[in-house]
């Protein structure tokens, strides 16, 4: 016979790693082409002028310029405008 009752298996004790989602470059920041602006699940924020969208809904700059967050038709949109020198 067992001298000790077997320990019950725990139901908790696990946690998923964070995915580091969110805005990576903010309004007014200067960015280079290819810089990631937003990492997101689904289109919380839509791509505007000079912004591309990856298959995982990541928004990235297509040109060098300044980031601008706007609303268009009730949707949040992020655009990149060239900086005048």
UniProtKB/Swiss-Prot annotation:
GO biological process assignments: translation
InterPro entries: Ribosomal_bL27 (IPR001684), Ribosomal_bL27_CS (IPR018261)
Region called Disordered, residue ranges: 1-20
Gene3D superfamilies: 2.40.50.100
Keyword Cytoplasm attributed: no
Family annotation (Pfam families): Ribosomal_L27
GO terms assigned for molecular function: structural constituent of ribosome
Key words of the record: Ribonucleoprotein, Ribosomal protein
HAMAP family, A to Z: Ribosomal_bL27
PANTHER family to which the protein is assigned, alphabetical: LARGE RIBOSOMAL SUBUNIT PROTEIN BL27M (PTHR15893:SF0), RIBOSOMAL PROTEIN L27 (PTHR15893)
Family: Belongs to the bacterial ribosomal protein bL27 family.
Name of the featured protein: Large ribosomal subunit protein bL27
Source species: Sulfurihydrogenibium sp. (strain YO3AOP1)
Gene name, Swiss-Prot/TrEMBL: rpmA
């Amino acid at each position: 016979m067992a001298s000790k009752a077997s320990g019950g298996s725990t139901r908790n004790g696990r946690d998923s790693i964070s995915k580091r989602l969110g805005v990576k470059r903010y309004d007014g920041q200067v960015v280079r082409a290819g810089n990631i602006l937003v990492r997101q699940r689904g289109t919380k924020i839509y791509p505007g002028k000079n912004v591309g969208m990856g298959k995982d809904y990541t928004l990235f700059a297509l040109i060098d310029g300044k980031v601008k967050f706007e609303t268009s038709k009730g949707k949040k949109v992020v655009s990149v405008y060239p900086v005048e020198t």
